[in-house]
């Protein structure tokens, strides 16, 4: 027998090895819509998921059931009800949702369990675990419309999920979750996948749609989108009446996930064999990645940044979280400020007021844009301000806060008496605000 030399295989393997090493031990959340599950290529997707598991990747698979639920409703002559593009899940619908989700769970579990059959890894056992890892709560009533059993996530037991992942299991999550009162609720797969990815600090969230990612006006694949660009694409699709396609649902979740610390979100096709492997183990991938903007920078503020700082801090001032600062005051103190900017938008700021004689500094006016509070921007600012204080020869750093006491305590600050403040600061202390004083050694 003459063996054929396949140089493409050799080159492909050489290129994939670094990614195999990089991905091992990382957590990936995979979102499978009902459209992907009923497609002929689904068996290949399941096999590829099994392969990822065999490479040491920690996998959470979240499945949806939208087309299966709609088919169930049609078969039972029960008209689907939507309000603001969200399904209203009445009692009859809930039973049909549970039926569809239950059948899919059994089917996916069975397929994953035998996904390595007819491969060199045949005989390797895959544990697939499902459970009440999420607690739901009702969406409630909106504009007089009761969403009934449509819900959202209240909390996630990430410790229990991590234990299963540590034990080598694939965690499988469906669209039905229970509340603390024992009621069942219908949730969207994109919300479950997004919140799981954030809570588990996943390296990646991966979704499937009918096309190979997001396309441009000429039909070409856009290989990378920043969250702001992905959000603009969502708004564009919604303006065209597209609220529930696989693309728009995944992009909504990907924007939130990226802004909350998930490094990369990948959108690929469920129709093309091998999309998952090509996306993860090749240099250029095959679909669209949503990634954090590379233009982010942390720097000292200038007079041109005052407008952005004011826009960031005004809502917090109105809520009484920050002390109000006028534009004139900001102009005089702008050299005290450090900002984090993304795409020319100020998303975080903090100021350092040194008291040189006492060798102590105050970190003040700490603010982070709501879209970025789940990430590490506050810690980045704290590290930068502490470094600036050390360069000035300061030995201690203090803050006055009414709301963020625990956050600072978790980062080495301890509550102290007002008497430990610098004399000039002590005279300005506002006893009506009753801010707590916390202090840390700079070392």
UniProtKB/Swiss-Prot annotation:
All copies of domain N-acetyltransferase, residue ranges: 296-443
Database matches in InterPro entries: AceGlu_kinase-like_sf, Acyl_CoA_acyltransferase, Asp/Glu/Uridylate_kinase, GNAT_dom, NAGS_kin, NH2A_AcTrfase
Subcellular location per the Swiss-Prot or TrEMBL entry: Cytoplasm
Highest taxon above the source species: Bacteria
GO CC annotations on file: cytoplasm
UniProt GO molecular function: L-glutamate N-acetyltransferase activity
A Pfam family assignment: AA_kinase
PROSITE patterns, per the entry: GNAT
Keyword annotations from UniProtKB, A to Z: Acyltransferase, Amino-acid biosynthesis, Arginine biosynthesis, Cytoplasm, Transferase
GO biological process assignments: L-arginine biosynthetic process
Reactions catalysed, as given in the entry: L-glutamate + acetyl-CoA = N-acetyl-L-glutamate + CoA + H(+)
Pathway(s) annotated for this protein in UniProt: Amino-acid biosynthesis; L-arginine biosynthesis; N(2)-acetyl-L-ornithine from L-glutamate: step 1/4
SUPFAM superfamilies: Acyl-CoA N-acyltransferases (Nat) (SSF55729), Carbamate kinase-like (SSF53633)
Documented EC number(s): 2.3.1.1
Main localization category: cytoplasm
UniProt xrefs under PANTHER family: AMINO-ACID ACETYLTRANSFERASE, AMINO-ACID ACETYLTRANSFERASE NAGS1, CHLOROPLASTIC-RELATED
Subunit structure: Homohexamer.
Family: Belongs to the acetyltransferase family. ArgA subfamily.
Name of the protein described by the UniProt record: Amino-acid acetyltransferase
Source organism of this protein record: Salmonella typhi
Organism taxonomic ancestry: Bacteria, Pseudomonadati, Pseudomonadota, Gammaproteobacteria, Enterobacterales
């Amino acid at each position: 027998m003459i063996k054929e030399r396949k140089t493409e295989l050799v080159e492909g393997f050489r290129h994939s090895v670094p990614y195999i090493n990089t991905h091992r031990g990382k957590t990936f959340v995979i979102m499978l819509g009902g459209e992907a599950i009923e497609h002929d290529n689904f068996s290949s997707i399941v096999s590829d998921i099994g392969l990822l598991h065999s490479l040491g990747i920690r996998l959470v698979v979240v499945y949806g059931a939208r087309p299966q639920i709609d088919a169930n409703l049609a078969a039972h002559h029960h008209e689907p009800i939507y309000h603001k593009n969200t399904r209203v899940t009445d009692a009859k619908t809930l039973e049909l949702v549970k039926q569809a989700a239950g059948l899919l769970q059994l089917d996916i579990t069975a397929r994953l369990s035998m996904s390595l059959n007819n491969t060199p890894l045949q005989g390797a056992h895959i544990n697939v675990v499902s459970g009440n890892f999420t607690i739901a709560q009702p969406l409630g009533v909106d504009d007089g419309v009761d969403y009934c059993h449509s819900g959202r996530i209240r909390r996630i037991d990430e410790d229990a999920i991590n234990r299963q992942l540590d034990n080598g299991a694939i965690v499988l999550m469906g669209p039905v979750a229970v509340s603390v009162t024992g009621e069942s609720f219908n949730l969207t797969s994109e919300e479950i996948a997004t919140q799981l990815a954030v809570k588990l600090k996943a390296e990646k969230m991966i979704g499937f749609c009918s096309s190979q990612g997001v396309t441009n006006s000429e039909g070409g694949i856009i290989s990378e989108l920043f969250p702001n660009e992905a959000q603009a694409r969502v708004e564009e699709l919604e303006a065209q009446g597209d609220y529930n396609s696989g693309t728009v649902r995944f992009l909504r979740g990907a924007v939130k996930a990226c802004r909350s610390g998930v490094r990369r979100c990948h959108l690929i096709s469920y129709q093309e064999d091998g999309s998952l492997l090509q996306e993860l183990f090749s240099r250029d991938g095959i679909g669209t990645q949503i990634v954090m903007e590379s233009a982010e920078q942390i720097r000292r503020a200038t007079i041109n940044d005052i407008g952005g700082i004011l826009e960031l801090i005004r809502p917090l001032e109105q809520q009484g979280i920050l002390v109000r600062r006028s534009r004139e005051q900001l102009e005089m103190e702008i050299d005290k400020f450090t900002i984090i900017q993304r795409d020319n938008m100020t998303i975080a700021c903090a100021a350092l007021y040194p008291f040189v004689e006492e060798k102590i500094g105050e970190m003040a006016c700490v603010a982070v844009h709501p879209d970025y509070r789940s990430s590490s921007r506050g810690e980045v600012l704290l590290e930068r301000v502490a470094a600036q204080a050390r360069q000035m020869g300061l030995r201690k750093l203090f803050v006055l806060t009414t709301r963020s006491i625990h956050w600072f305590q978790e980062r080495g600050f301890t509550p102290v008496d007002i008497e430990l403040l610098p004399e000039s600061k002590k005279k300005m202390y506002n006893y009506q605000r009753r801010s707590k004083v916390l202090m840390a050694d700079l070392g």
